[in-house]
């Protein structure tokens, strides 16, 4: 939470080898606990105090990271200069469209009114830039809980957190960070669709399931056989799953 220099060093040591094993591009996005000077120096080997806005191309899918942070504050803003830059980038569509990555999600927070004080300010200015563009989705964080909405007609997906999450049911607290429900979001990009999956992290207890080896059995079947085996409630395959789990 303090944007300490050593945290960026350790972050690269953890993330970059994992990304290399997956042949994945790492895209960093500034958050309200980051400090621009250390962020740019230790993650990008650059000396800068400017907003950390960047453009990436992943096989024709454009990903734009926009720095919504305000130095010294927790709420978010996008300056007029940043908006002009973003409008210029979006003036030319990408082959597979664009994903916009920001920290502060441009959506309401009805279950936590306090977070409204820390939201992205002047959202109408960003909406004016995005309307009619090729932006297919907006990816965000900041809230420490998962939620979804739309903004300027664009789907918005907010990832929770891998540290602490906010308890949306804590009526006797202004905000309550808890050690529970941590997760990551995985986004699958198709030609005409985005699929957002919330994947819990940490220990869980299985209450129902099939062994991994069952997939080989299903793969060998025809489409019709798969329906009769996996979809039919009374099939021996499903009966075995029910009996083996109680």
Question: Which stretches of residues belong to each language-model region?
Answer:
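Alpha-helical scaffolding within the catalytic cores
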Residues: 40-54, 86-88, 143
